[in-house]
Amino acid sequence: MDAPDLHLLLHPRHKEVHDFYAGYEAEIRPHLCDGCNTCAAMCRFDAVEYGTPKPRINPLKCEGCKVCVEFCPTDAISFTPRHCGTWYISHTRMGPMAHAQLFPAQENSGRLVALLRQHAKKLAREQGIRLILSDGPPGIGCPVISALSGVHLAVVVTEPTPSGMHDLARVMDLCGHFQIPVAVIINKCDLSPRIAGEIETQCIQDGHAVVARLPHDSDFVHALVQGRAITEFSSGETVRQIKIAWERIVALVNLPHPGDKARAMGAETLEDPVTEENH
C-alpha cells in the first residue's frame, strides 16, 4: 500500500533491512557543468531549475526521463539508480512479515510489490506456512496488478457509497480478466443499507461471494490507538462477523494438497504449495 499501517498493529521486529532502488535520477556534477542551462530548457517536468551560475535538479520533480543527460553538451549529468526506500523482513507476534517504507514523494511500484511477494513466498516455504496474505493497494494500477498476479483469491473490501460501488466494479473487472475468484466484505454496511443491498445483489449475480457485512464500529479506532487488532481488543458482534468471514475465506481458498502442481482456483500452485490471498 502507499500508506501502510499494518506495522502499527503488529509492531514488527526487523530481522533484515535492505535498500530499495527503482528507476533512475539525474544529478548535475558542478565541476563539469558550464552553466549553459540546456538541461533546464529541455526538461518538460520543470525538474531543472535555472541557476546562477549553474542549474540544479529538484529530485522531487525528476521523472528520470534522461533527456537532460542526452542533451548535456559537457556530459555533466550523472544518471544513477534512485534510492526510493527500505524493505524489511520482520518477525511479529502473528508470524513473519515482508514489508517496506518508501521515502516522501516516492510512488509505490509493481516492482516493489513483486519483490516483497517473492520474499514472502521464500519465508513461507522455509517455515512451512501454507497461506500468504498480501495487502493490496487501492485502484487498478501496476501495484494492484502485481499484487493480484497468481493469487488464489482476492478479498475486496468496499463501502456502500457510489464511489465504493464504482471502485468495486473496476477491481472485479480486473480480477475477472486474470480469472481470480473474488470475495467481498462490505464495510460500514449501515452507512447506506440500500447501497449495501445493491452491492450484495450485484455480487451474487456476478458469482462473487459476500463473506461479511460489517457495521460501523468505533472499536476499530480504539483498538488501533492501543496498537492491537480489533480481534484482540473486543469480543462484540463485529469481531464475531470477522471470524465468520475468515472461516468463509479459508473455505474459498481451498488449500491445495502437498505435491499437487495443478492450477487451483485460477492461480499457480507451487511444488511445495503456498496459497496466496490478496487482501
Q: Where are the language model's segments positioned?
A:
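Conserved catalytic-core segment of NTP-binding enzymes
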Residues: 74, 81-89, 111, 115-213, ...
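Cysteine-centered iron-sulfur cluster-binding motifs in ferredoxin-type domains/subunits
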Residues: 27-46, 56-76
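C-terminal lobe/tail of nucleotide-utilizing enzymes
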Residues: 174-279
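Hydrophobic alpha-helical segments and helix pairs
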Residues: 61-99
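Phosphate-binding/switch loop-helix module in NTP-utilizing enzymes
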Residues: 40, 49-52, 58-65, 69, ...
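Walker A/P-loop NTP-binding active-site region of P-loop NTPases
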Residues: 1-23, 51-61, 65-66
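Conserved active-site and cofactor/substrate-binding residues in soluble primary-metabolism enzymes
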Residues: 34, 38, 63, 104-111, ...
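Alpha-helical scaffold segments in soluble metabolic enzymes
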Residues: 5-8, 38, 42, 67, ...
